[in-house]
């Protein structure tokens, strides 16, 4: 149990793929313009991580070493296709909002990295846990950035992309939006602020 708890805390906090390892910067910046956008991308990536880790772990003794990366990509692409079809069928607005970054999950360095570094070398249950934890860590980072970028850039929380969800307007920020925060430049700035804050907190804990 302690090992599972350690794996969970590592994926969410100590080894967060975005906030500590600084992986997946491109989709993080592009899809964290709002909370719901970020949540959708994070959950999609988590589903792909879980499914691909399980399948790759099951096939780890069958896949030839020389062609392992192409095989990993084929497996990951299968799960990404499932996600695309589901979103296109049931959450069309989110599907359109994520755009090209949804199919680009196939070559996301976080997912390929976990397939190569962990799933291909470990049993199914640990690989599944690793996929869930890393996916939740990615989702946490996206939602955190999405919250601040949406709040500062649009003055709302939980707006758009889901039918019946109109969002909550925060009066001061809604009247004085910092539009740059929902642009790519604002994404880089917000990511820098959050990374700096996390490094500061971690340095204090070490001291």
Kindly label every feature range from the protein language model.
Residues 7-10, 57-61, 126-134:
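Short amphipathic alpha-helical coupling elements at transmembrane boundaries
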Residues 63-76, 97-103, 127-130:
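Cytoplasmic-side transmembrane-helix entry/capping segments in multi-pass membrane proteins
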Residues 131-153:
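Hydrophobic alpha-helical membrane-insertion segments
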């Amino acid at each position: 149990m302690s090992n599972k708890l350690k794996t969970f805390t590592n994926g969410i906090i100590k080894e967060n793929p975005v906030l500590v390892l600084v992986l997946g910067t491109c989709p993080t910046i592009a899809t964290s313009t709002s909370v719901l956008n970020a949540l959708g991308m994070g959950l999609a990536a988590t589903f792909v991580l879980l499914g691909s880790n399980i399948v790759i772990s099951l096939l780890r003794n069958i896949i030839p070493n020389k062609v392992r990366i192409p095989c990993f990509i084929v497996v990951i692409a299968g799960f990404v296709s499932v996600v695309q079809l589901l979103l296109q069928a049931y959450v069309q607005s989110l599907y359109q909002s994520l755009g090209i970054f949804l199919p680009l999950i196939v070559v996301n360095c976080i997912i390929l990295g976990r397939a190569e570094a962990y799933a291909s070398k470990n049993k199914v249950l640990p690989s599944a846990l690793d996929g869930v934890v890393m996916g939740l860590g990615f989702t946490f980072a996206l939602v955190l950035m999405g919250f601040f970028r949406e709040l500062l850039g649009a003055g709302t929380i939980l707006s758009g992309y889901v039918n019946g969800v109109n969002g909550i307007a925060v009066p001061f920020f809604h009247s004085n939006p910092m539009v740059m925060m929902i642009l790519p430049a604002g994404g880089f700035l917000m990511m820098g602020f959050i990374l700096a804050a996390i490094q500061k907190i971690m340095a204090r804990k070490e001291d």
